[in-house]
C-alpha cells in the first residue's frame, strides 16, 4: 500500500520566550521557514518573542 501524502499546510504552536507557558496556534505552509513573531503575552502583560516549538512524540 502507498503511504498517505503529507498535507501542504501544518498547524504550529508558537511558545512565549518569557517562559510563561502561554502559546498561540497558527497554520503555515510546510515548505516555509519556522515562524517567529512578537505577540502580546497576557501573563507578563507585554509583547514578547514567540518561537515555533519543535514537535515531539509524533511519528
From Swiss-Prot:
This protein's record includes keyword Ribonucleoprotein: yes
Subcellular location field: Mitochondrion
Cross-referenced InterPro entries: Mitoribosomal_protein_bL33 (IPR052008), Ribosomal_bL33 (IPR001705), Ribosomal_bL33_sf (IPR038584), Ribosomal_zn-bd (IPR011332)
A Pfam short name: Ribosomal_L33
One of the protein's GO biological processes: translation
Record keyword Cell division present: no
One cellular-component annotation, GO: mitochondrion
Main location per the UniProt record: mitochondrion
Keywords: Mitochondrion, Ribonucleoprotein, Ribosomal protein
GO MF annotation list: structural constituent of ribosome
UniProt similarity note: Belongs to the bacterial ribosomal protein bL33 family.
Assembly, per entry: Component of the mitochondrial large ribosomal subunit (mt-LSU). Mature N.crassa 74S mitochondrial ribosomes consist of a small (37S) and a large (54S) subunit. The 37S small subunit contains a 16S ribosomal RNA (16S mt-rRNA) and 32 different proteins. The 54S large subunit contains a 23S rRNA (23S mt-rRNA) and 42 different proteins. bL33m stabilizes the tRNA acceptor stem in the E-site.
Protein name as catalogued: Large ribosomal subunit protein bL33m
